Every structure is written in C-alpha cells, then in structure tokens.
C-alpha cells in the first residue's frame, strides 16, 4: 500500500497531524496499536501551566517568547510562538467543526478545572460542560456547589472531593454539598451496579427515560444557580447533546469532571478525531504496530555525513506486505504508551532504534524523593531530533521521518502542564513541513513534465 504520509501513533499528536494532512489533500494512513493516552486524560487542552522551575504561568501564549529564551531546549522554543498559536487555533476550529467545541477565557488566561479529587488544575481549553474557574479563585462567582455521583460508582467520590475543596482557602465562602443518585435501570441489569464504570453508565443514559429520571433526581438535590458537578458519564457523539437536554430540563448549571480511567472526556476527543479522519478519507489501521522500517542512504558518496531516508514499514498484521509513503511521522508517545522503553542501564526507541537524549547514569534518571517537587529527570528524556523535529539514527538525520508529541525530549508534560499543547503543535508542525515538501516536489515534477513536453 502506498501513501503520501504514514503516521505511527493514534494519540493527540498523531491524529492532529493526520487531520491536517488530510485537509491538504494528502493520502494519509494512521497506524494505531491500541488505546491512546487520551483514554486517561482530562479532555482539556493544557498549553503551559508551569515552567520547569515550578513557576505558575497565567497567560501561556503571552509567556511563550520569554519561556523559549529561558528554556531553549524545550519543543516550544523550536516551534516558536507563531506556530504554537496557529496550531492551537487550528485545533480549536477543527474540533468545533466536528462537534466538540473548546473554549478558553476571553482574556487569554489559563483557567482552573475541577479534578475528581477536588483539587484545581490549570488548563487553557476546555469542553462545554467543564466549568472554568478563574485563576484568581477569590473572583469565583459560584455560591453553592453540589457534588453528585451515581450510587455505587467507584470512580468519583464526592465526600473526598468535598474535603479537598474545603482546604482551598480562596473558596472558604463556597457552600459545598454532596449527594448520591440511584437509577431504576440498575434493576434491569444482571451485574452488580457497583461494578459499573463510566462507559457502562453512559450506555444506560443513552435511553431517554433514564436521562429523564436522572434529571428529576438532580432537581431534588440542587436549585437553579447551583453548580452541579457530575462525573463524566456521557459518551461521545450524543453525549454533549444529552447534557444540554438535562440542563434544559432542570435549569441547572452542569459541570463534568473526568473520572478515574477510562475518561469519557478524553475518549470524546479521540473518537471525534478518529471519526473525522475516516470520514475525510483517511486510512485507520487499528490494532496493528510497526515492527521495523527499511532505510536507505541519501548520499552514499559521503557515508559519514549522509542522511537516511525511510522507504517503507513492516507491521505485525501485514507481515511481508510493506506500507510505503513519501513522508512518515512517529508519534508513539513516551514510556506509558511504549513509544520509549527502559532497560537496566539505557533507554531505547523500540521501532527504529533512534537516538535518545538521555543521561548516561541511571542514577541521574530519577530524583531521590519519589514525590519530588521537581519531578523526575527521565520524564524529560526522549528522541533526539533536528530543530525541525526530524529523527536522528546513529547520528544521521532521517530526512522524511518527523517526531511529534510525548516522544520528544526537552520537556516534562506532567510537571509543566504542556502535554496537549506540545502534542498538537508538534503534530501540526510536522504536517505543515510535510505539506510544504510534497507541494514543492509536485511542483518540481510538473515543471519537469512541462519542459519535456516543450522539447
């Protein structure tokens, strides 16, 4: 099979890159081995919440230029402010067009979102029913919050969230109540309702009668003007419309919080992007993974300074039938997604054996304290690339293999709150670079053809 672009990895970076390539008319394939980290995500888009030194960032876009000068090895420094802004705005527009509107504060500031543990986390874009608390919590206008769960649901504990919220001094005037709701639909299932996860409950709530029962129960515990916090139990596709329906029935203000995995807020993003990719004509190879790539030298006359070129891939499911493309993108994630692996004394990129930016001593990989405020150094390690995010193998640049997302080195997405921002921006940048190269190549071919005809 031949493509213009093959993207390895079906997470945020890979799908962002794939959608942009399809927009430009490129024949594109995505190879996804399984569930991405989006199944464990909040469903909000973090651009930059903290600097590596731990300083809080209030306005991420305005901070990017200074941030890039202070941390020149960070992916944002290589991308530049203009590219990051274009990428995030493009993503926001794209997701809105496919049914998942994302909004930020009008003044461009980060906002706080509520976590299932009752803490506040800084982010930049959130989905429609994720309540945006101001960064200055003393300006919070909500007077009463009602934390409500489904009876027996284990992945959201209102009492725990309530206790943690009461520890936030800026919210000392906020009245916080909790409640648990039971659904009669539990009587019709054969499983113990305490075993149900968010996906199971979302299936029950796909029936209008069950949603109406939920709406009535909510009205027994809250009044208009209250902020009603629910675990994310409404799936993709019709999930947002169900929430709007319940809000209209109850006249309550609803707030979704991500649950312990699986997170339907994150799944909503992934499934929406995958659906759009397939609808636009993309090829999705689910449940497959690349086992090796076939390379060639660009300049054999000077092996020491020669570049590599990736010609084709072999995957587990396709066996001896290779997948060929003009350009490739590696977006397989970090250790969590097995895009990187660690041995006793070294880290490896398991597909192509790419060069890794890592410390030689294993003792330098981690901090002495497990819960260190500075996090662990291994979280900032990843693939060595050029400034244009082209991969490097044995010291040689691979001209047509770009890297994007958590596999990149030089940043700590967990500490910084920059994971989604880097994923989207680097995926978008890879797509833009590929589009430019292929358009130049096609233009050159057309000019050569015209010249031959003229002769």
From Swiss-Prot:
What's one GO MF term for it?
glycerol-3-phosphate dehydrogenase (quinone) activity
Q: Which reaction does it catalyse?
A: a quinone + sn-glycerol 3-phosphate = dihydroxyacetone phosphate + a quinol
Top enzyme class: oxidoreductase
The cross-references to Gene3D superfamilies, in alphabetical order and at most eight, read: FAD/NAD(P)-binding domain
- The record's EC number reads 1.1.5.3
Does the record bear GTP-binding in its keywords? Answer: no
Pfam families in UniProt: FAD_binding_2
- Does the entry feature the keyword GTP-binding, yes or no? no
Task: Give the cofactors, semicolon-separated.
Answer: FMN
Cross-referenced InterPro entries, in alphabetical order?
A: FAD-dep_OxRdtase_2_FAD-bd, FAD/NAD-bd_sf, G3P_DH_GlpB_su, Metab_Enz_Cyan_OpOx_G3PDH
Its assembly, as annotated, is: Composed of a catalytic GlpA/B dimer and of membrane bound GlpC.
The UniProt entry's sequence similarity note says: Belongs to the anaerobic G-3-P dehydrogenase subunit B family.
**What protein name is recorded for this chain?**
Anaerobic glycerol-3-phosphate dehydrogenase subunit B
Species whose genome carries this gene: Aliivibrio fischeri (strain ATCC 700601 / ES114) (Vibrio fischeri)
Q: Which gene encodes it?
A: glpB
